């Protein structure tokens, strides 16, 4: 059975690691605050590639790194 990747949890951990609030990270990444909160709380389980690209760029990592 394949392990399900929790993208929202990965993003939340990365954001907390760099010490940014959801609001501050939303501004930094260019992703709407409401979208970010929905991703982190798994309301949005599969964000678009464009959203993932913005988030990855703000962290300075690849999209693939967010999926690990």
Annotate each PLM feature.
Residues 1-17:
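A short, Lys/Arg-rich alpha-helix, primarily the initiator
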Residues 9, 24-27, 65:
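Residue-level preference for short helical/loop micro-motifs built around acidic side chains
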Residues 12, 16, 30, 41:
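Residue-level detection of the helix-turn-helix DNA-binding "recognition helix"
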Residues 12, 37-38, 67:
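Key DNA-contacting residues within the recognition helix of helix-turn-helix
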Residues 16, 27, 57:
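Alpha-helical residues within the helix-turn-helix
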Residues 20-38:
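Short alpha-helical DNA-recognition segment
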Residues 50-65:
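DNA major-groove recognition helix of helix-turn-helix/homeodomain DNA-binding modules
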